[in-house]
Amino acid sequence: MSGNSIGQNFVVTTFGESHGKALGCIIDGCPPGLAIDEADMQHDLDRRRPGTSRYTTARREPDQVKILSGVFEGQTTGTSIGLVIENTDQRSQDYSNIKDQFRPGHADYTYQQKYGLRDYRGGGRSSARETAMRVAAGAVAKKYLKQVHGIEIKGYLSQLGPICAEILDFDQVEHNAFFFPDAAKLEQLDEYMRELKKSGDSIGAKVSVVATNVPVGLGEPVFDRLDADIAHALMGINAVKGVEIGDGFAVVNQKGSEHRDLMSPEGFASNHAGGILGGISSGQPIVAHIAMKPTSSISVPGESMTVQGERAEVVTKGRHDPCVGIRAVPIAEAMLAIVLMDHLLRHRAQNMNVESITPVIGMK
């Protein structure tokens, strides 16, 4: 009811605030026998954690995850997996000036109205700091998906402000601080971000995520369509204002003869649908994109109001990302993994013994 959990068979529940003692999560429904340890999660946590480059927040958190339960002798037991990450680099005094003010564009005002109070330190529960636990849980899902089903999930920054990737080279993604797939644009990105930081402003971004080797048949009609659940999960990431599956909003300008993905026994001719037909996976790569707004935590003064309803001018202090899309890449991967993991378990529960006379496209 309180909106802190996602999933039906693979359930992830997170807790914690930006400046609290720790962040944590509980994973329910992970099958037993999966070899897992902290190192499996730490790789993605290190990709997401703050303070790793000059393009992200200066807050330095090691984000060392600890497994509290659900794993014995290196394997999942089938019981609840408890995870925790301690907060070690809070500077709550940076937020004392906004204790009685609302930052425009943030959740300060809406949290105050909903709950009658709020944790003003770094945004409290509304902070993207919470996503560290999603990444940890997503790493568990990613390992199961790859080890048991051969499913791989990769994300990348496809656009930062006006700069778009024209080449998709996954080999480049993990070798630059932007998670950007087009090496020819890296110098341009660097210059753009340096000028942006000088101005004290921020910028939006587009993040893309792709899952390959997904089997046919995942997704439930009508309200638990696979694309609906993916959109729900991705939309739940902080700062996301739009989600596209496949060609997304570009379909507005497409004709039916162009958009339909023609099929033959050898394979599909295209993938405008993004790997999902009728809410069910088609066996093609699942492709999703998210649009992320520019953070409102900037040093440019802005008009707002106080808790008492008086006019105020707000200048956000503290340490913030000038572009939240950069560190969102592993978060988007994690959310897609959690949804696919959940739907795999749901599909197995109901349809494990289903046999179709129709061959899988591309497998003949």
Curated annotation (Swiss-Prot):
EC number of the protein: 4.2.3.5
Binding site for NADP(+): 48, 54
GO MF term set: chorismate synthase activity; FMN binding
SUPFAM superfamilies for the chain: Chorismate synthase, AroC (SSF103263)
Keywords linked to the UniProt accession: Amino-acid biosynthesis, Aromatic amino acid biosynthesis, FAD, Flavoprotein, FMN, Lyase, NADP
GO biological process terms held by the UniProt record: amino acid biosynthetic process; aromatic amino acid family biosynthetic process; chorismate biosynthetic process
Keyword Transmembrane helix: no
Cofactor stoichiometry and binding remark: Reduced FMN (FMNH(2)).
PROSITE patterns: CHORISMATE_SYNTHASE_1, CHORISMATE_SYNTHASE_2, CHORISMATE_SYNTHASE_3
Catalytic activity of the protein: 5-O-(1-carboxyvinyl)-3-phosphoshikimate = chorismate + phosphate
Superkingdom to which the source organism belongs: Bacteria
Residues reported to bind FMN: 125-127, 238-239, 278, 293-297, 319
Pathway: Metabolic intermediate biosynthesis; chorismate biosynthesis; chorismate from D-erythrose 4-phosphate and phosphoenolpyruvate: step 7/7
Cofactors, names only: FMNH2
GO cellular component terms, semicolon-separated: cytosol
Self-association and partners: Homotetramer.
Family from the record: Belongs to the chorismate synthase family.
Function noted in UniProt: This reaction introduces a second double bond into the aromatic ring system.
NCBIfam families reported for this sequence: aroC (TIGR00033), PRK05382.1 (NF003793)
Name this protein carries in UniProt: Chorismate synthase
Native source species: Shewanella loihica (strain ATCC BAA-1088 / PV-4)
Name of the encoding gene: aroC
